[in-house]
Amino acid sequence: MAEQTLKEKTAKGLFWGGLSNGVQQVLNLVFGLMLARILDASDYGMVGMLAIFSAIASTIQESGFTAALTNQKEIRHEDYNAVFWFSTLTGVSFYLILFFCAPLIAQFYDKPELIGLSRIVFLSFLFGGFGIASNAYMFKTLMVKERAKIDIISLICSGTIGVLLALNGFAYYGLAIQTTAYIGIGSMLKFCYSPWTPTFLIDWRPLKSMFRFSSKLIVTNVFTQISNNIFSVILGKFYSPRQLGFYSQGQKWMGMGNSFVGGMINGVAQPVLVQSVADKDRQRNMFRKMVRFGAFISFPLMFGFAFVAKEFVLIFLGEKWSSSVLFLQIFCCWGAFWYLQSLYTNLLISHGKSDLYLYGVVINSTLQLLFIVCFSYFGIYFMVVGFVIANVIGLLLWHIIINRVVSINLFSVIKDIIPVSYTHLTLPTT
């Protein structure tokens, strides 16, 4: 009965995750095309310069508590309550710190306009803290349907706000307010939808036990965010906002395709894998099913997107975005395999191996930076190629780490993805 129940939860989660991500991608497509038609590359570049600060602060604010709470077998109200107040107070603290650091950020990039812009973008920390505990509750209990509704409503509201502001000449401020509105509306709805509610009787003791697990996740995720956003810093500092804007657009549209696949799988992967952690054979089978399912969706989507990237950009975004085509094609090559890295890390976290997760991320991030530096002599596009090569090599590293924990044969994983990948790699040439 427990097996059937878990299968039903997984199927339901994949269905609602797929439906939610499908609708979100359509909405992102509509709003993204509208904004790209109205704004130019430098507007996206201005917001992109702040990406690394937002990513690192959000990671520290979340502190790995969602994963820590999901891994706990017995959870009390006090656990969620401690996380709620910690994330809320951390959000307020980060906003105040970054509010006063805004002039220093603007000075680093030599862009005085970033002072006001950053203070709007960083409001997302303030709003985001209110929804972390509620999101963790909904994630652990597989409330995928409710989370889907929240994401869609938040996207519609924030996208409409962004387009209206862009039409009225707010330029990059429209993008900043759109992002902040999305997080704010999402946090409010999670707070309302979640059956759990906070109280003022605060007990900080649960955080101590969670920090033993989550502290490594914090460091890990900070490394991940630095490696993912290092291009934004390099291009913002040494190149123009326009170049950063082209890079951001290429990464953005690839990310939308990735989000469709990753959203379906990540919405259920860790909770489901945690519930089968005691039976490694069963967990291996579930993992391989997710690998095959991900390959079936990811390879045709990402390789197909790379094949039509030029036509997509010229027809839907316009000639002014033609310089983002090659970025998009390069990123799509890595995007086809990205879901595998996500599955590996989810499997590792389900076993509570945050130390091995940290080890893998640090090595992978170091590898990325090494390849970026080595390829930087040849220009921006080669730097992105180096980034992709490093990530593909990193998949082998992740498998070696996972094999120590669960004993998954590398050739089994290759056998799961080769038929699908071969079909879709050769399809454009037939």
Give the residues covered by each predicted segment.
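Alpha-helical transmembrane segments of multi-pass membrane transport and lipid-handling proteins
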Residues: L29, W85-D110, G116, T160-L164, ...
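Helix-loop junctions and terminal segments of transmembrane helices
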Residues: T59-H77, M138-K140, P198, G250, ...
